[in-house]
């Protein structure tokens, strides 16, 4: 029996509909490539991108190529009212970290810095205030770095511990050639990282812990932040799990020392 395509569109309209679908698909793919992939790479930069950064700026610490199960934990914006809780988590799990100190938060917390050093933690320089370091003049940034350096040195002297190599992490994480040159002249190594849960902006501690664990790789440098209530539960989740997976969680200096060939 013959079939009559009573509801079939004329061929001209079918071609037009097909072109419309193809165009819509093209727009979708373009949007994914233009917006979604770059956003995802910012949130979770792939290994090849971190490796490119390390080659492009070899004077900056991003990660350390190694097959050893070892990562550096770095914690910005210390000290705060949460620092001692963070210290307790690290001690309970046989872990250590490099804390990047904001000088404006130190007054009244000098004993906390001393305790951190005595417990095997490391202190890095994060300037005096929580602001983009790149926007400061050379003289202002130099003054801030040296002021924080004095505070850090006093903590090591009080703890009776030798001062380790000097690390600087710029406020907001951005740098340029001028900042890199200035930091080097002051005897510092610029330290960034490869695993960053964006915890200043994202307060969901379970999500942040999962982010860290999903990005975990030998030689990684984790960046997270003190001064937030959600950091403590995030580390309570992430640090024991890293240890369970066989990773050592150490300071920047220990990572560089133990992976040196």
Predicted segments with their positions:
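His/Asp/Glu-enriched short active-site or ligand-binding loop at hydrolase and phosphoryl-transfer sites
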Residues: 174, 179-215, 247-258
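Active-site beta->alpha N-cap acidic-glycine motif
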Residues: 47-136, 140, 144-157, 163-165, ...
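Basic- and aromatic-lined ligand-binding clefts that recognize polyanionic substrates
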Residues: 155-176, 180-183
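Non-membrane alpha-helical structural segments and their capping/turn regions in soluble enzymes
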Residues: 138-143, 206, 229-232
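Structural detector of well-ordered beta-strand residues that form the stable sheet scaffold
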Residues: 72, 98-100, 124, 169, ...
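N-terminal pre-catalytic segment of deacetylase/amide-hydrolase enzymes
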Residues: 2-73, 79-92, 238-241, 245-261
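Active-site environment of divalent metal-dependent phosphoester hydrolases
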Residues: 80-82, 130-132, 174-178, 198, ...
């Amino acid at each position: 029996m013959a079939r009559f395509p009573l509801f079939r569109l004329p061929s001209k309209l079918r071609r037009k509909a097909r072109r419309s679908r193809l165009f819509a698909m093209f727009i979708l793919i373009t949007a994914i490539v233009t917006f979604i992939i770059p956003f995802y790479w910012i949130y979770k930069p792939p290994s090849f991108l971190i490796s490119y950064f390390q080659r492009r700026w070899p004077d900056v610490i991003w990660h350390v190529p190694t097959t050893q199960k070892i990562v550096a934990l770095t914690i910005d914006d210390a000290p705060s009212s949460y620092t001692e809780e963070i210290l307790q988590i690290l001690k309970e799990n046989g872990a250590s970290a490099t804390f990047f100190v904001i000088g404006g938060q130190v007054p009244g917390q000098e004993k906390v810095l001393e305790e951190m050093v005595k417990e095997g933690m490391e202190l890095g320089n994060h300037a005096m205030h929580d602001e983009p370091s790149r926007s400061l003049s050379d003289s202002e940034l130099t003054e801030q770095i040296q002021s924080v350096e004095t505070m850090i040195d006093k903590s090591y002297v009080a703890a009776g511990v030798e001062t380790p190599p000097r690390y600087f992490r710029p406020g907001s994480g951005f740098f340029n050639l001028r900042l890199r040159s200035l930091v080097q002249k002051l005897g510092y190594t610029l330290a960034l990282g490869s695993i960053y849960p964006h915890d200043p902006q994202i307060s969901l501690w379970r999500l942040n812990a999962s982010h860290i664990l999903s990005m975990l790789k030998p030689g990684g440098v984790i960046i997270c932040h003190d001064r937030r209530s959600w950091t403590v539960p995030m580390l309570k989740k992430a640090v024991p799990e890293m240890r369970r997976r066989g990773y050592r969680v150490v300071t920047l200096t220990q990572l560089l020392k133990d992976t040196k060939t």
